[in-house]
Every structure is written in C-alpha cells, then in structure tokens.
Amino acid sequence: MAIKEETEESCGSRAVVASITKESPRQHRMKLEVYGEVLQRIQESNYEEANFPGFDDLLWLHFNRLPARYALDVNVERAEDVLTHQRLLKLAEDPATRPVFEVRCVQVSPTLNGNSGDVDPSDPAVNEDAQSSYNSRSLAPPTFGSSPNFEALTQAYKDHAQDDDSAVNAQLPNSRPMHEITFSTIDRPKLLSQLTSMLGELGLNIQEAHAFSTADGFSLDVFVVDGWSQEETEGLKDALKKEIRKFKDQPCSKQKSITFFEHDKSTNELLPACVEIPTDGTDEWEIDMKQLKIEKKVACGSYGELFRGTYCSQEVAIKILKPERVNAEMLREFSQEVYIMRKVRHKNVVQFIGACTRSPNLCIVTEFMTRGSIYDFLHKHKGVFKIQSLLKVALDVSKGMNYLHQNNIIHRDLKTANLLMDEHEVVKVADFGVARVQTESGVMTAETGTYRWMAPEVIEHKPYDHRADVFSYAIVLWELLTGELPYSYLTPLQAAVGVVQKGLRPKIPKETHPKLTELLEKCWQQDPALRPNFAEIIEMLNQLIREVGDDERHKDKHGGYFSGLKKGHR
C-alpha cells in the first residue's frame, strides 16, 4: 500500500503541493534577507501600513507563516504585492467573505535569461505589438516576476517544437498584457483543482501559477492568465464574483467542487462511527484488530501513516488514517478504496487483506511490499534500469492495469510512487484511494491525480475514460527510462499548463530504442482516441522484449533487476 509523503506533489491534497517543511539554515537566512529588503522598500515608499504599530513584526509573521519558497520567488521590487498578500490572508479569516481575491493587469516579457531568443526587436510587427501594449499605460510585472519557471516553460516548448515537427502548434507567450489573479481562502483538499476549474469556466488560460499553504491553514494562490479581452480589471472581477455566486447557489448535491468556499468546523462531529462500505454479501473485509500487530512506521503523510506489521502471522502493510485529519472527503475515498480493493485479485496488483471501518481505528491492510516503490528506487536510491529490466517492469505494470481496466476500474493516479516491488522483484499497482469504477456511459468528469503524470483531458476537467491511465503510463515509462522527475524544471501547475496548452511532453533520449520511442509517443497522444489500450501495449512490449534479445533477459548474477535498490539498503 502506497502512501503520499509530504514532499509529493498532488492536486488532491494542498499540503503536498506547497507543504511547510523544516527550513534549512540557508533558506532561513535567505528568507530573512528578503524580509529585510521588502521592509526597507515599504518604509522608504511611505506606505501607510509601515506606520502601524508593530508592522515589522507583522510582516515577519507573514513571511514566517508561508514556506521559504514564497520569499525566494517573490519579486522584492514589488513590495506592495506583499502587502496585498497580507491583506488577502487577513480577509480570508472571515468565513462570510472568502474566497477573497485581487485582480490586476500585468506585463509578461518573452525574454529568456535576458535574451530575446527568437524575437527580433527590429521586426515591425513586434514593435507594433509592443507599442499597443505600452501606449496606454505602463504595466507592472507579475508578483513573482517573469519567473525562471515561466521562462523554462517557454524554452521547453521551443526545444520540444524543434525536436518534434508534429508538436502542437500553440502560440508562445509574448510581450502582451495578462491578468494576475490572487486568491486566498481556507486550505482544503483539491483546492487547486477547484480554482483552476473555475478559471477555465471563464475561458482563462493559466500561463503561470504559484500555490502556497500557510502554517495555520490558509492558502495563497497566484495565477497569471490570458484570455480576457480587456486590460481593465473591473469586468473580470465581476465575472469572478458571478462565478463564485453561481457555485454557491448550486444545490448541496452538486457542491462537490466548491468546498473551498466554506470551512465547516463541525465536520468531525458529523462523521459516522463506522464507514459504510457497499457490499453484495459475498465477502467480508473487516479485520480482527486483536490479530493486528503494528511494528514499524514506514512513511508518514499529511492524512495518514504507513506501518509494517503482522496480521495472523502474515507480514502486512497497514495504512492508518490520522483521526484528527479525517473529514467527509477522506471517508469517501477510504470507502472507495476498500470497495475496489476487496474485489481485486491479480499478481500485478497489491493484495488487499482487510480493513477496519470503525472510528477512530480506520485502516487498510495489504500485503507488505519489501522492496518499496519504484519512485524510491529511482529518486532516493538513484537506481538505474537496464533495457531488459525496464521492459520487465513496464510489462508488470501494463498487466496489472489491463486487469483493472477489464474490470472497469480506472486508477486515476498512476505514477511511480504507486508502483511497488515485492521480494520476488514483481512490480504491482497500488493505492486506489482515488480510483473509480467506470460508469456505464464509459466517461467520467471528476478530476484527481498528480499533475506531472496527469492526462490533458483530466487537467482540463473534460470527460475522460480508461485512456487517461494510458497517458500516465507513458510518463511512468519515461521516468523508468531516464530516472528523472517529469518536468522537474517546472512547478506541477506549470507542467499542467504546458501539457494542455503547449503540447509539452518530456524529452525522449536520442539513444532510446526506436520501438520504445514509438510506444511512448502513442501512449501520450493529446487525443485519447489515438492511444492504445493496455492489451495492445502488452503485445507491443512482448514484441520489443523479443527484439532486444534473449541474452539480456537474465538477471545480473550479482544484483538482479533491482541491484541499485539493494545497494541503497546496505
């Protein structure tokens, strides 16, 4: 059973997108330096707030409640924006007014690291465009400047377009007015998905995004968008207000997407003593807690902890939900995970043992996977796959996913962190907290998962089906091939923007086997209808394994397929 750690990035949980982790001494020093410079600029500019008693302490409190990344990214030349963030976070404390937001027009430059790239300043069209942008008034840059991430996204698309003639012909960001929208509200699960969905409803394209969570449970989300035809902001503000009111006026049964508007402190009081799991009367999953022995903590996340232990003398993994963090949404996912896993029986899917559905001891028990996750093997232990072992892992995953799809189960969060290895070097699919049984119509609309691995149709909140898992599988294959984190130079939201609007994909190494390159490109097609299903993927992998040759199928005599992982545990 996999569990999300604090450092993972997911749109399903705010805490993992911008988690407040312990700062290093270097980060703390840099935060202090930025704080000092912002304070000095505010005082020198004679802002009214600078005269408030204890303002310097309040400003430091503002920086200290936000992660170090906020201080490192903020444009110190725009000290007034820090005051805006302070004000919004204060207003967000009132349930009657949140979510609160601010809108302003900004100018985004296309220059990359001080170079104009392909932009020719002598081009009359460029000059005309620049004149039309600047004539009326001088616009300020975004709060976080023309950030390295935004520049990286632009450059990455250029590189991608040069390497791939079939790249999506999307327009690169140019020097034109855009709008910066800053939201603040109570911190809630899936908040980022809800905000991006609302912006999408207004026809706005997110070009840059910065998401922060405060240590005391609030959010600060800054989006740079285009798609609004006018530079003025009042019309956009009115449109945002109407969109918020529209969501608030929806019947309770349709308010799954607007939990960020209110924070119900009484939620825990309404939670049932026992979680109801749908049943057909053919099986039992409730475990005998007296037979469950918890031994060693393996991982800890925002909403649960993973332990190693035994159940009836069998070695097991035990995922325990933290009672103080349990809410109605978590109970739905817990119920769904038990409902799906109790029916799953396949050698490439982690085996479900049972669950305790009685509060406060909510837990799920599965077989223990001794070798941990593929994510840890690649990124923590710096393991490397040879081509034959890579294909073996890819085949294991595709078999597990094919079984799930044959049983109308869409995983929705396929990534290396959810792929586990047992003592026999068999890789299995795990973590069904956000998986769903496909509807009779064959399409689904609820968004979830992890942005770096997520299919474009899911990011855009469009109807989707099992082929969304195929896209995620392609990103997993690329990760196995390179050992790198997908789009590591971008934040998760910026990666999502690139995938949807720029046709961005990870760069395939030139030395990759041509058939593997072909498989990757088929699986991450923008159009889901062009992607193969897992039965077809299995056939392609078997053919590729035969082509690679029998001599590479055997394990390394010293370490097996996962020798890098074994070394990491010495």
Curated annotation (Swiss-Prot):
Residues 112-145 are annotated as: Disordered. Activated by autophosphorylation at Thr-445. Keywords: ATP-binding, Cytoplasm, Kinase, Nucleotide-binding, Phosphoprotein, Serine/threonine-protein kinase, Transferase. GO terms for cellular component: cytosol. Its main location: cytoplasm. Residues 180-260 form the ACT domain. The modification Phosphothreonine is found at residue 445. It catalyses: L-seryl-[protein] + ATP = O-phospho-L-seryl-[protein] + ADP + H(+); L-threonyl-[protein] + ATP = O-phospho-L-threonyl-[protein] + ADP + H(+). It holds the Pfam family PK_Tyr_Ser-Thr. The gene is STY17. It is found in: Cytoplasm, Cytosol. Autophosphorylated on serine and threonine residues. Autophosphorylated at Thr-445. Changing residue 445 to A: Loss of autophosphorylation and enzyme activation. Residues 292-545 form the Protein kinase domain. GO terms for molecular function: ATP binding; protein serine kinase activity; protein serine/threonine kinase activity; protein serine/threonine/tyrosine kinase activity. This is Serine/threonine-protein kinase STY17. Belongs to the protein kinase superfamily. Ser/Thr protein kinase family. It is an enzyme of class 2 (transferase). ATP binds at residues 298-306, 319. Plants silencing STY17 does not show visible phenotype under normal growth conditions, but plants silencing STY17 in the double mutant sty8 and sty46 background show more severe retarded growth compared to the double mutant itself. Serine/threonine protein kinase that specifically phosphorylates chloroplast precursor proteins in the cytosol within the cleavable presequences (transit peptides). May be part of a cytosolic regulatory network involved in chloroplast protein import. Does not phosphorylate mitochondrion precursor proteins. Specific for ATP and does not utilize other NTPs. Plays a role in chloroplast biogenesis and differentiation in cotyledons, possibly through phosphorylation of chloroplast preproteins. Residues 129-145 have a biased composition (Polar residues). One of its GO terms (biological process) is chloroplast organization. The modification Phosphoserine is found at residue 441. The active site is at residue 413.
